[in-house]
UniProtKB/Swiss-Prot annotation:
This is Peptide chain release factor 1. Residues 284-304 have a biased composition (Basic and acidic residues). The keyword Cytoplasm applies. One of its GO terms (cellular component) is cytoplasm. Methylated by PrmC. Methylation increases the termination efficiency of RF1. It comes from the Bacteria. Peptide chain release factor 1 directs the termination of translation in response to the peptide chain termination codons UAG and UAA. It comes from Maricaulis maris (strain MCS10). The modification N5-methylglutamine is found at residue 232. Residues 284-308 are annotated as: Disordered. Keywords: Cytoplasm, Methylation, Protein biosynthesis.
Length: 357
């Protein structure tokens, strides 16, 4: 797909405008806003300039090939075909950069992991996933903060929520939402039989200017004692907070030691969940006419299987199978899966744009 000249000129012009305004800006908020846009536009403008120059050079070389000087024409011919061979790669890279952006891709995110079918083993697997994403976040240079956790009786988590902050968190992790399935022999299994368990992962964007008004009149707040693994009460005061959003039925529980902190945390998670619900509804509306989507986008869709006996991880949406289970679950090898999903999404969206063109 060829990037149109008008679109390239538009990108370069906008970058020049932002750069000029950044040099003259005095307001701190405006500087922050312009700096962010400048950082986003710079690689696109550089690629656009490189492509523009390559196209112009190709036209010049084509003229030189028609010239009277045979030696110069031959040199021009060699350069022309070498550049012509490189041009599709530049065009493709530029087309990817010009794809419409998901406005939430640059946002921070909350990750919620819930043990599904499989009892204790599902909770242990939820704990494995938590460790995998925490390590991945560390490798990406993101910050990770545990927000709330309900521990499993034999390790892992029944449910756990963490906040991840950094550059492009949601854009990289958004395809992790869905049902993750594990096949392995649990530590508690004496017969050596393979069990299948599952955990659900939800990645929820947290834009800085989250556009959600939470009417506390719609929220029922209950306080109770925080409980640890096995259900035992870990303190003697009613510090745990459960918030129920009555219109949607969404429930959030936070059970750290401070009730005040739990209230603030629960509100934050509730807002993220409501925003995510709004976003999912909008996506579902577009899904009917939209091509180029990775999987169904449904949170109940089984997206990936981790098969321990075979050392295999399979992502069912893109037919990807890797025999690198230990490396992936450790977090170190997860980026290969993430990058494959992003590349597949970009290819599908490019194909959809070409179909519409």
């Amino acid at each position: 797909m060829h990037a149109p000249e008008a679109r390239l000129a538009q990108v370069i012009d906008r970058f020049d405008q932002v750069e000029a305004r950044l040099g003259a800006a005095g307001d701190a908020d405006e500087i922050v806003k312009l700096s962010k846009e400048h950082a986003e536009l710079k690689p696109v403008a550089e690629k656009a300039n490189a492509l523009k120059s390559a196209r112009a050079e190709l036209a010049e070389l084509a003229e030189m090939m028609e010239g009277d000087d045979a030696e110069m024409a031959e040199m021009a011919r060699e350069e022309f075909y070498a550049l012509k061979e490189r041009l599709p790669e530049l065009e493709h890279a530029m087309s990817l950069m010009l794809l419409p952006k998901d406005k939430d891709d640059s946002a921070n995110a909350m990750i919620e992991i819930r043990a599904g079918t499989g009892g204790d083993e599902a909770a242990i697997f939820a704990g494995n996933l938590y460790g995998m994403y925490q390590r991945y976040a560390q490798l990406q240079g993101w910050s990770w903060e545990l927000v709330s956790a309900s521990e499993g009786e034999h390790g892992g988590y029944k449910e756990v929520v963490a906040a991840i902050s950094g550059n492009g968190v949601f854009g990289r992790l958004k395809f992790e939402s869905g049902v993750h399935r594990v096949q392995r022999v649990p530590a508690t299994e004496s017969q050596g039989r393979i069990h299948t368990s599952a955990a659900t992962v939800a990645i929820m964007p947290q834009p800085e200017d989250i556009d959600i008004e939470l009417d506390m009149g719609d929220v029922r707040v209950d306080t109770m004692r925080a409980s640890g693994a096995g259900g035992q009460h870990v303190n003697k005061t009613d510090s745990a907070v459960r918030m129920t959003h009555i219109p949607t039925g969404l429930v959030v529980v936070c059970q750290e030691k401070s009730q005040h902190q739990n209230r603030a945390r629960a509100q934050e998670i509730l807002k993220a969940k409501l925003y995510d619900m709004q976003r999912e509804a909008a996506n579902a509306e577009r899904a009917a006419e939209r091509k180029g989507q990775i999987g169904s986008g449904d949170r109940s869709e089984r997206i990936r299987t981790y098969n321990y006996p075979q050392g295999r991880v399979s992502d069912h949406r893109i037919n990807l199978t890797l025999y690198k289970l230990d490396d992936i679950v450790a977090g170190d090898g997860l980026d290969e899966v993430v990058a494959a999903l992003i590349a597949e999404d970009q290819a599908a969206r490019l194909a959809a744009l070409e179909d519409d063109a």
